[in-house]
UniProtKB/Swiss-Prot annotation:
Function: Functions as an electron carrier between membrane-bound cytochrome b6-f and photosystem I in oxygenic photosynthesis.
Family: Belongs to the cytochrome c family. PetJ subfamily.
Record-level Gene Ontology MF annotations: electron transfer activity; heme binding; iron ion binding
GO BP annotation list: photosynthesis
Encoding gene (name): petJ
Protein name: Cytochrome c6
Amino acid sequence: AASGASIFSAKCAQCHLGGKNIINPTKTLSLADLQANGKDTVSAI
């Protein structure tokens, strides 16, 4: 199975470089934003 880091690099890093979000700057990968947007669990992602 692929590691989380390799999956992130392949599928997410283009838009979430440095934990930010180039599409919607208010939805970063900070824990506070993940919780506010209901994306703070593995199953939610």
